[in-house]
Amino acid sequence: MQTTHLGKNSPIPQSPEEASLDYVPNPRQGKNYLIRFAIPEFTSLCPVTGQPDFAHLVIDYVPDKLIVESKSLKLFLGSFRNHRAFHEDCTVGIGEKLFTEMKAQWLRIGGYWYPRGGIPIDVFWQSGAAPQDVWLPEQGVPPYRGR
């Protein structure tokens, strides 16, 4: 198992393009199970105004041979702090990158964005039909009411 960040002092990358994700062998290959990451304080910048945007992200996936190493994921997500992109681009881009690089069996991401201009925007993406033999709990983020 070769990791770039785990056990090392790693600064937050300046952009998502500079960030690298580490993957490690799935310790339970052959078993279908769900891994969930909840990121309640995700931050990026509006591509037009440069104002900060905030979201609660929930990433669920069913791994195949690899799982994402959580420190590298934290650094990757932190790299969006100074990244200008629309909510949709951030949410779907994160999901696609993880799914494609990790070659997960299935992945979904929910981006629950806090309102700017009075309108919350929630963005959802998944790689395909959910597996039938895996417990898929609700993401548990209520509709906006001062989340």
Curated annotation (Swiss-Prot):
Q: Write down the top EC class of this protein.
A: oxidoreductase
Q: What superkingdom heads the lineage? A: Bacteria
Catalyses which reaction? 7-aminomethyl-7-carbaguanine + 2 NADP(+) = 7-cyano-7-deazaguanine + 2 NADPH + 3 H(+)
Q: Pathway of this protein?
A: tRNA modification; tRNA-queuosine biosynthesis
Biological process according to GO: queuosine biosynthetic process; tRNA modification
Provide the active-site residues from the annotation: 46 (thioimide intermediate), 53 (proton donor)
Is-annotated flag, keyword Membrane?
no
Q: Where is this region: Disordered?
A: 1-23
GO CC annotation terms, alphabetical: cytoplasm
Q: Does the keyword Cytoplasm apply?
A: yes
SUPFAM superfamilies per UniProt: Tetrahydrobiopterin biosynthesis enzymes-like
Binding positions for substrate per the UniProt entry: 68-70, 87-88
Cellular compartments annotated: Cytoplasm
Which EC numbers does the record give?
Answer: 1.7.1.13
Cross-referenced HAMAP family: QueF_type1
Among NCBIfam families, the record links this protein to: QueF-II
Q: What's this chain's function?
A: Catalyzes the NADPH-dependent reduction of 7-cyano-7-deazaguanine (preQ0) to 7-aminomethyl-7-deazaguanine (preQ1).
Give the UniProt family note: Belongs to the GTP cyclohydrolase I family. QueF type 1 subfamily.
Name this protein carries in UniProt: NADPH-dependent 7-cyano-7-deazaguanine reductase
Report which gene this protein is encoded by.
queF
